[in-house]
């Protein structure tokens, strides 16, 4: 059995920054309305780059810009490609992401090691319309996470069969799981695109972990300024202080040591 070689944290960050730099180049070339978001925005403002105990890179952009990004991404790739844009499930959410094709990850939860297909990545959050009422958003958000929960159940039901006589059953189980997973991911993505960005006054990304109380505003994508993230010039909302205070409160104050937690995965070379 091939032994996996874990990737040091510094190398993971370098890989992510290589992906990020390429994404920024594409977005600037095609004049896409992207911003760095969530912990990445917080890291840029408070630390000038990564939050010391984390290595996330999150980008968000309106749906129409994301569709353009998706269309031109492969044309901007080197040959052979170093990165690829993927949609569908990543861990336990339906977030599009860009991955380094030469790496993989192992997720460690409750003492179990679970291998996932994705690699070192950068998340891309498409932003859509939030609906026309608070009820629209609440109902659509609940439906999205209902579908995501079904995909989690599918992952949870999977058990490999060590007995060779049962491997045919395993093959069919895998096929059925794949079909069910595809169904629920598609339904989740349909929820995300239910309301048009331009037709709605309020906007939202259903894949956010912050719930329906997250306050996203069109001005964040229309009025942007440059900011450095680990030496890479990228776009942030001019009103970044307002956005960060909405999400984190007094974001300049560091959290207690026990709450400074990063990911629960271990990246490795394929």
Locations of the language-model features?
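Active-site nucleotide-donor binding segment shared across nucleotidyl transfer reactions
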Residues: 24-57, 61, 66-67, 219, ...
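Conserved catalytic core of two-metal-ion nucleotidyltransferases
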Residues: 4-28, 73-132, 151-249, 254-270
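Helical (often loop-to-helix) elements that flank the catalytic cores of nucleotide-handling enzymes
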Residues: 70
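A short secondary-structure junction signal
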Residues: 133-139
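Mobile amphipathic helical/loop "lid" adjacent to a hydrophobic cofactor/ligand pocket
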Residues: 147-148
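Short, His- and charge-rich active-site/binding loops that engage polyanionic ligands
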Residues: 142
């Amino acid at each position: 059995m091939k032994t996996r070689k874990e990737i040091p944290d510094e190398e993971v960050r370098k890989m992510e920054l290589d992906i990020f730099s390429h994404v920024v180049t594409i977005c600037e070339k095609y004049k896409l309305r992207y911003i760095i978001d969530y912990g990445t925005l917080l890291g840029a403002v408070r630390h000038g780059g990564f939050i010391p105990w984390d290595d996330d890179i999150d980008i968000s952009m309106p749906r129409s810009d994301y569709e353009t990004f998706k269309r031109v991404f492969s044309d901007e790739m080197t040959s052979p490609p170093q990165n690829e844009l993927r949609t569908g499930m990543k861990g336990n959410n339906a977030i599009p992401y860009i991955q380094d094709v030469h790496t993989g990850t192992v997720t460690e939860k409750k003492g179990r090691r679970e291998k996932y297909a994705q690699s070192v990545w950068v998340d891309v959050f498409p932003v859509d319309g939030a609906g026309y009422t608070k009820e629209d958003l609440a109902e659509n958000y609940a439906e999205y996470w209902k579908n995501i929960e079904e995909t989690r159940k599918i992952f949870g039901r999977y058990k490999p069969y060590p007995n060779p006589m049962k491997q045919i059953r395993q093959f069919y189980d895998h096929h059925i799981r794949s079909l069910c997973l595809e169904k629920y991911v598609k339904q989740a993505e349909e929820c995300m695109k239910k309301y048009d960005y331009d037709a709605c006054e309020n906007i939202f990304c259903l894949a956010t972990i912050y719930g329906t109380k997250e306050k996203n505003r069109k001005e964040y994508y229309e009025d942007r300024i440059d900011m450095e993230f680990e030496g890479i010039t990228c776009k942030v909302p001019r009103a970044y202080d307002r956005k960060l205070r909405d999400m984190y409160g007094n974001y300049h104050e560091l959290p207690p040591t026990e709450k400074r937690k990063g990911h629960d995965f271990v990246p490795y070379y394929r």
